[in-house]
Amino acid sequence: MAWLADYWWIILIILIGMLINGIKELRNVDHTRFLLNKPKLPPHRDNNDKWDNEEDDWPKKKP
């Protein structure tokens, strides 16, 4: 771990460079074009649909 104490500044420069490159790439993302050409989601599959029509076992609420 002595090398970490000697070369901590190199690791810091690499991390700052990665952060700056990430910010640059995020600025290049065109969110409006993505929203206009957004892929359709498949329909939601309801796994409980066969039980929805049956009566519930819960007691009825009294008015």
UniProtKB/Swiss-Prot annotation:
This is UPF0370 protein ECA1289. InterPro entries: UPF0370. GO terms for cellular component: plasma membrane. It is found in: Cell membrane. Residues 39-63 are annotated as: Disordered. Coiled coil: none annotated. It is a single-pass membrane protein. The chain crosses the membrane at residues 3-23. Keywords: Cell membrane, Membrane, Transmembrane, Transmembrane helix. Belongs to the UPF0370 family. Its main location: membrane. Pfam families: UPF0370.
